[in-house]
Regions:
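Short S/T/G/P-rich N-terminal loop/turn motif that feeds into the first structured element of a domain
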Residues: 1-171
Length: 171
């Protein structure tokens, strides 16, 4: 998976135009086409994030959803993440809206949640704690009425190239 972050659609357009007409862009595509086949491309826009945004978070739980009630999802996440039980949440959580390319690897999606951690051990330890909280149980009730999960995967960053942007810039 290649994830490219842009601060705006205008910046994305500028970068793509520059890349498409360059020898570096052609070289990258030549190599990429030998080792990978694109299966999906989509554009997302962050709605809100919780936790501490950090480029050190390289292990992600990526959850694709078909949301029927975005306001309930946002309010439910706000309530859960602001609860006293989750005050020591070690990672970061992002709720994003899928603007284009809503057919994901699993099925149709309107939104995604990304939950980032510095390690899989941190993810595992926090999940064990989270699943025992009242806040999580309440969130499950809201979630079951507001969306269907269409795909879920664990994503581990192999390398991050930050072209004058870091994840913290998108907070």
């Amino acid at each position: 998976r290649v994830v490219v972050l842009y601060p705006s659609m205008t910046e994305m357009d500028k970068w793509n135009s520059k890349l498409a007409g360059s020898s570096d862009g052609a070289a990258f595509m030549s190599i990429a086409n030998k080792v990978a086949k694109p299966v999906a491309q989509y554009i997302t826009v962050p709605m809100k994030n919780w936790g501490t945004v950090s480029s050190k978070d390289t292990h992600w739980d990526s959850i694709s959803m078909n949301v029927t009630n975005p306001a309930a999802v946002l309010a439910g996440l706000d309530e859960m993440m602001s609860s006293a039980e989750l005050k020591d949440f070690p990672g970061e959580l992002w709720l994003v809206q899928v603007l284009r390319g809503q057919a994901g690897a699993g099925a149709h999606m309107t939104h995604q949640m990304y939950v980032g951690y510095e390690s899989l051990s941190e993810l595992d330890a926090w999940s064990d704690k989270l699943y025992q909280t009242r806040a999580w149980k309440k969130w499950l009730s809201i979630a079951s009425e507001s969306f269907t999960i269409t795909n879920r995967e664990t994503v581990n960053w192999l390398k991050a190239y930050e072209h004058s942007y870091s994840l913290e810039d998108f907070e």
